[in-house]
Amino acid sequence: MTEKHLFTSESVSEGHPDKIADQISDSILDAMLEQDPEARVAVETTVTTGLVVVVGEVSTTAHIDIQKVVRETIKEIGYKNGKYGFDGDNCAVITAIDEQSPDIALGVDNSLEVKNGDVDPLDQIGAGDQGMMFGYAINETPELMPLPISLSHHLMKKVAEVRKNGTLAYLGPDAKAQVTVEYDDNNQPLRIDTVVLSTQHDENISLDQIRKDVMDQVITKVIPDKYLDSNTKYFINPTGRFVIGGPQGDAGLTGRKIIVDTYGGYAHHGGGAFSGKDATKVDRSASYAARYIAKNIVAAGLASQVEVQISYAIGVAQPVSVSVNTFGSGKVPNQKLVDAIRKVFDLRPAGIIKMLDLRRPIYKKTAAYGHFGRTDIDLPWEKTDKINELKKELDF
């Protein structure tokens, strides 16, 4: 008898309170990078009814209007005219921004390697913190992402599309989706077991209409027919009402959706959030590098799935460790993969920044609908341009 198992991942919309906070933090980061590509930025945002609070540490020559950036971001998401209990024009915005700690800057500006006499310019920047970061790729979708998180993101993007283009103009900005996939004993996706989708809506719309419209205009347009059958379960706005949402319904905070941002729980996570951080913070840049490595390994046919871990010590440029797990799917030994990774990819913070060109204002667009597997935007860590170098290094 074939043993089947279920796996579930979720995504949230750009109007979810935590995602509003992420987008504000990354909008501020982008605004600073536009003026000062060398800016050191660590910005955290919290949102609640009628209030946005922005705190953090910044070292930059940029002069930006944080109030304007915050308000424009909120309005772009869809919170304007007071319609959904939160309004970019009328909310209060409080900021408390300090300079980066000189003790941290001491290790980031001049790494341990430089202090010991190394002169390679890419050794200059030390890791901004200790920690471990993970990257993952699997060949079950064209973008080399796990199917549950991929479908969850696509559902949320479709909800935003039909809200903004007027197809379902009664929808509000806040929404969540969750997809449960049934796998066979070879870990191949068989079918969709359950779809959960909750979306904010205007008060005068009936639940029956919402359920029909979401089914017709979102779910059936996103999920391939081959995965749906008569036993697939759908829970559309299962509470029966979702009028109050966004920051009026729940407070939001930067960095609270790290699993949505990555692989939907399908792979490990080092715990560090991305949004609001410049590329000297390895929480962000090394996670992007790890995904870049993993995607190129799978795209090269060296494994059908792989998880890459990189770890750092604060103030030290070279990673403390690099490891891989191919879950038995590798075509070459793991140690050979690690050796090839170290030769093909420069994993010093300055090396990652150069390799992926990370001193650009490219981050706001990553702050909703996932940082990985994106086909709608051009992200450097999603490129598969290291395939030939990896194969050559491994004689594959």
Curated annotation (Swiss-Prot):
* Pathway, per record: Amino-acid biosynthesis; S-adenosyl-L-methionine biosynthesis; S-adenosyl-L-methionine from L-methionine: step 1/1
Task: Write down the chemical reaction(s) this protein catalyses.
Answer: L-methionine + ATP + H2O = S-adenosyl-L-methionine + phosphate + diphosphate
Question: Where is the protein found, in the record's own terms?
Answer: Cytoplasm
One Gene Ontology cellular component? cytoplasm
The molecular function terms in GO held by this entry are: ATP binding; magnesium ion binding; methionine adenosyltransferase activity
Q: Which residues bind K(+)?
A: 44
Keyword Transferase in annotation: yes
A Pfam entry, by short name:
S-AdoMet_synt_N
Its cofactor is: Mg(2+); K(+)
Name the source's superkingdom: Bacteria
Which amino acid positions bind Mg(2+), per UniProt?
18
Positions binding ATP in this chain are 16, 174-176, 241-242, 250, 256-257, 273, 277
Chief subcellular location:
cytoplasm
Asked if the record carries the keyword Transferase, the reply is yes
The record's remark on the cofactor is:
Binds 2 divalent ions per subunit. Binds 1 potassium ion per subunit.
**Biological process annotations from GO:** one-carbon metabolic process; S-adenosylmethionine biosynthetic process
E.C. code: 2.5.1.6
Start and end residues of each stretch annotated as Flexible loop: 100-110
InterPro entries xrefs: ADOMET_SYNTHASE_CS, S-AdoMet_synt_C, S-AdoMet_synt_central, S-AdoMet_synt_N, S-AdoMet_synthetase, S-AdoMet_synthetase_sfam
- Keywords associated with the record: ATP-binding, Cytoplasm, Magnesium, Metal-binding, Nucleotide-binding, One-carbon metabolism, Potassium, Transferase
Q: Which HAMAP family match?
A: S_AdoMet_synth1
Q: What does this protein do?
A: Catalyzes the formation of S-adenosylmethionine (AdoMet) from methionine and ATP. The overall synthetic reaction is composed of two sequential steps, AdoMet formation and the subsequent tripolyphosphate hydrolysis which occurs prior to release of AdoMet from the enzyme.
- Which family is it part of? Belongs to the AdoMet synthase family.
What is the protein name given in its UniProt record?
A: S-adenosylmethionine synthase
Q: Which organism is it from?
A: Ligilactobacillus salivarius (strain UCC118) (Lactobacillus salivarius)
What gene is behind this protein? Answer: metK
